[in-house]
Amino acid sequence: MLTYEEHFDKSCELRSEFWQSVGELDPDVIAHLINPSFMGGPVWPSLRQAFATIRRPDVTIIASDGLSDPYEEGDNDYNGLGMEVYVETRPIEGSVQNTWQFQLVYQAAQLMAEQGNVISLLEELTYITTEFYDVDVPFKTERGTVGAILGLPSTSFNNEVTLSLESVKMVNIKLLTLAELDYILQNGDEGRVKVAELLIAQGDATLSTLERPSVI
């Protein structure tokens, strides 16, 4: 039986191998000097909070790196929250840390850590929509939030990766237009599914840009 440290190291290794198969993985992750959980923020499974950058000729991917770490304490029979989240966007030159795309995936990752068992809700509903604060895009709601839909499937790489204890989902976070968000808020489950289907039909379903035409 593997020790916790061996499970942790193996999970990190397998996640890195997965992203290296998708594109060029930046050698350094983005992480805090002081862990936000020490200042009252959400606690990630192994405490470690990091983000990986993956570059392809056509897109840049920014992904959480740690939501699927094995839990440091308690039940270690599964890989953390059973998921990582990512944003896919047009190529970004240099550091991604000060971009709205990073803000989007950062807020999503913190929400996943705070809520805990989001993966079960995704398995039940397929898609989830939510709103985030502190994402610096030109269009926001009157509440100062942006809308996003979680769970649109990638057609260019696998949506799951097998780690040391189980398979975990790589969950896309896609920025919504105000019209799309409003339609979902007005129409509930039916509206969410319709917008998801329209986004898939539009093409580049997992890509987040500010220039994309609204499907509503």
Tell me the role of every PLM-derived stretch.
Residues 1-63, 67-70, 74-80, 86-216:
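Acidic, proline/glycine-rich low-complexity IDRs
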